[in-house]
Amino acid sequence: MSLKTPKGTTDLNPDDALVYEDLIDRTKNIFKLHGAVPIDTPVFELKSILLNKYGEDTKLIYDLKNNGGEECALRYDLTVPFSRYMSMNKLKKIKRYQIGKVYRRDQPSVVQGRWREFLQADFDIAGESLPMMADSELVCCMNRLLKTYNIGDFVIRVSDKRILYGIFEVCEIPNNLFATVSSSIDKLDKIAVNDINKELKLKGLTDKQIINLNIYIQKSGTVDVLDFLRENDVYKKCSEAVDDLCKLYEYCKIMKCSDHLIIDLSLARGLDYYTGMIIEGKYLNKNIGSVAGGGRYDNLIGSLENSSYTNTYNVPCAGFSIGLSRIFSCIQKPKVNTNVKVFISASGKLLLEERLKIQSILWEANISLETFYNKRNNPGEHKKYCVKHGIKYLIVVKEEQYNKGFVTVIEVNTNLENVIMIDNLPSHLQ
């Protein structure tokens, strides 16, 4: 039998797990800064709730074996479970965050940061609000997150699904091709436009439709794109959406989060439940695709199957997901790979009881520490261990010193030794 993890999954060693912990903490802090509260939902959901929500990606849902009970599937994202939670609890307003693993039966690619099991962090604003205020806060929150990870320069691309519908109408592309053509357009930042055009041709578009479509989907910028739309025939089809993006851009300027913002008409996120603004965050010069994405989904809660409140209960929502597994793959791993501050050793004898008493004193003072419970002590080896794992202090317990109420404390990086009274250890080490 071959011992390995399933394809598209990975273990985390202690070093990587500590980096993940720090990444999660930094993400939570930004969400809390924006006033979000945490929720949690099951890793698997009723299959009927997940179906028909993800467009062409529905095929990537992991079904669970039916053992004579409910038909279930692993969650594909955190948005649909959140909407189910809202509907079940008849909530009208919440600003929430959730961090958890999601599952997709995709073709994995470590280089491109694509896994079958990966960690996502979601931020959502549910409830009535002034037009584009919640959407603008999404941009602000995403902007702050991508800055705090300190990976490099990035862009936040926005558009609106209603503008896409307007473009398709002007280009005379039938509605039944919306999903498949949108999925091709969304690849424009990864694939050359000529290859996209060939793909569109294979999907049934005429040369005229492709030429007209290219006039729009190659437009990206800021106010210049909005001006272009206002002066174009498409404005009659989606004037509200264009005006909403104008508000979004102005609000983001006021909140000082427009420095990385781009209005990009090729943005066409494929999930069926988006109804308005769509958003995507991407680091430049990183071959991992987008690291964050989302948008407005005003009808998802009301559309859930088997909901007692369908057609009578609905809540407007906007939110985004950030792929922490992709972020992790870009982070420069720090040399310090432990959160332990102190190692307790002994010289000459085992001195187990003495070490345990010191251990108890330091734990009471909330000082993280480590000691070995084996049959031999070697302070020299323990110091090497401290250097390797980034532990700041080495305490060496010596019988004669201990009986007088003292121990030796070594600062590992400087080799500076101090004899410290045991009662003063917490204040010395903090």
Swiss-Prot record:
In terms of Gene3D superfamilies, this protein maps to: Anticodon-binding domain (3.40.50.800), Bira Bifunctional Protein, Domain 2 (3.30.930.10)
Q: What is this protein called?
A: Probable histidine--tRNA ligase, cytoplasmic
The Enzyme Commission number assigned here is 6.1.1.21
Would you name any one GO CC term?
Answer: mitochondrion
Q: Does the keyword Transcription apply?
A: no
Q: What organism does this protein naturally occur in?
A: Vairimorpha ceranae (strain BRL01) (Microsporidian parasite)
> Which cell locations does it reside in?
Cytoplasm
GO BP: any one term: histidyl-tRNA aminoacylation
Q: Name one Pfam family in it.
A: HGTP_anticodon
| Record has Ligase as a keyword | yes
Query: InterPro entries in the record, alphabetically?
Result: aa-tRNA-synth_II/BPL/LPL (IPR045864), Anticodon-bd (IPR004154), Anticodon-bd_dom_sf (IPR036621), HisRS-like_core (IPR041715), HisRS/HisZ (IPR004516)
Q: Which UniProt keywords apply?
A: Aminoacyl-tRNA synthetase, ATP-binding, Cytoplasm, Ligase, Nucleotide-binding, Protein biosynthesis
MF GO annotations:
ATP binding; histidine-tRNA ligase activity; RNA binding
> Which chemical reaction does it catalyze?
tRNA(His) + L-histidine + ATP = L-histidyl-tRNA(His) + AMP + diphosphate + H(+)
What family is this? Belongs to the class-II aminoacyl-tRNA synthetase family.
- Kindly report, in one word, the top-level EC class recorded for this enzyme: ligase
